[in-house]
């Protein structure tokens, strides 16, 4: 049997990152959350274990036809395999702190679990005289 334990993948080799267009917004305004995988190892059989629950947000998924891997620099390091796994437009449904739960990923059949950190957002109530408008 093959010894898969001889190859260890570090947090720098494979991780997920949720890019958001902003962290503070008015109730009814939107933000875009883009889930990206960053890898310095070959990626085979990438599968999300669970989609992050966007509790407190109305969501609209943006269709991603397939994962297209590109080269990108992040925190001073070059990653040859960076791809968008999911893109979602989020609309906060109430004021206060809103949270996106961690996300888990299995890759390369090794059962490697990569987790996106917990994220929080501030939903600001709509002010008197201000009408929330959808962002283009």
Residues of each region from the PLM?
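Surface-exposed interaction/ligand-binding surfaces
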Residues: 1-136
